[in-house]
Amino acid sequence: MKSLVLKAAAWLSDLRVAIVLLLLIAACSGLGTAIPQGEPAAFYHERYDAAPWLGVVNGNQLLSWELDHLYTSNWFLLLLAWLGLALLLCSLRRQWPALRASLRWLDYTKPRQLSKLAVATSLDTGDSAAALDQLERQLQQQGWAVRRQQNRLAARRGVIGRVGPLLVHTGLIVFMVGAVVGAFGGQRLERFLAPGRSLELLNPQGDTRLELQLDSFAIQRDPAGRPEQFSSQLLLRDGTGAPAQPAAVSVNHPLRHRGITVYQADWGLAAVTMQLGQSPLLQLPLQTFPELGEQVWGLVLPTRPDGSDPVLLALQSELGPVEVYGADSQQLGLLTVGGESQEILGLPLRIADVMPASGLLIKRDPGVPLVYAGFAITLLGGGLSLIATRQLWAISESGRLHIAGLCNRNLVAFADELPKLGSSAITGAPHDAR
């Protein structure tokens, strides 16, 4: 039984297994990008039953495979746990022992031991003890840690590079933990707010965590009328009775406040202010009409007191114009925002104003600090991994200086430098062993 556990641990800690898992998780994450996430089941049936995804996967299959919430699906979390376990075992079985071994001083006492190392050389010297002293001074000047004994020395440099792989594994594990915490503990809310309206965000106890009030909303358009930027001026209240704090949010410039991030995600039209005949100004809510286009808002308005002869008012921008259609789908007229009234089926209509609405995306993700920390640790570990760890041993014996060394990076360059280092120790000339 013990041997089976050890074999399983050895297989799980294999670097090739971790690489395959990383590629598989990356491919699955691509699926989550291609397939909309978190929509109602009816959305997937409507979209993929008639036209299956990639011509194969219909709505039922997509839902049964949990592709509608891929990042919190059981099989995706299992892949993350598997990768985390593989990295943990690899760190414990390989990286940690390698780090501990690099911190131990190895004492080679005989030249024959040095000759078996990856890089070794032996040089004639008139005074091997003096050459060893000179070599010690050179190594210390170049930043090597040196341990000297009577007729031999050991030196090392760049040991911190051994910490790099361990930090990379730790960072990836922290990153995955943060992703899981965010997937289960995070909250996401999309709302359209009209100016003057507010939205309360409650904590788990039902108390007001944050109140957002839209003070104003502006849409910047290019000469062709296409929206280029839209921004919201908000008032923030934290539920403690403190004065409201003004804040701004726009596209690519989110607002972060007490663990909550507010994005400017969309825009819409909330209401139209109009006059019917000699009536006072009336503010009527608008609704979307997807069957007329992607961004078309409007309302159905009766033109008679008994509710008969309705007309459809449709518009695509807060700037207008407002198109008026009859029950037979024929256009009856165009109304200018802020312009003069026009008679439609005997009823004078005037559009005074159109109120835009701000589409806000509100996220709370408790896993973000862990994700950022994981990225930082991984980057630090990757940088440290580039530092070459070099070890060197030298023994003076019978007029000869025996030098050998090990290096985990660019061994060829180290093999070229080692004889030069020994020669400079013999002649007393300085040599920069990088």
From Swiss-Prot:
HAMAP family: CytC_Ccs1. The chain crosses the membrane at residues 15-35, 73-93, 163-183. InterPro entries: Cyt_c_bgen_Ccs1/CcsB/ResB, ResB-like_domain. GO terms for biological process: cytochrome complex assembly. Required during biogenesis of c-type cytochromes (cytochrome c6 and cytochrome f) at the step of heme attachment. This is Cytochrome c biogenesis protein CcsB. GO terms for cellular component: plasma membrane-derived thylakoid membrane. Keywords: Cytochrome c-type biogenesis, Membrane, Thylakoid, Transmembrane, Transmembrane helix. The keyword Nucleotide-binding does not apply. The keyword Amino-acid biosynthesis does not apply. Its main location: membrane. Belongs to the Ccs1/CcsB family. It is found in: Cellular thylakoid membrane. May interact with CcsA. It is a multi-pass membrane protein. PANTHER family: CYTOCHROME C BIOGENESIS PROTEIN CCS1, CHLOROPLASTIC.
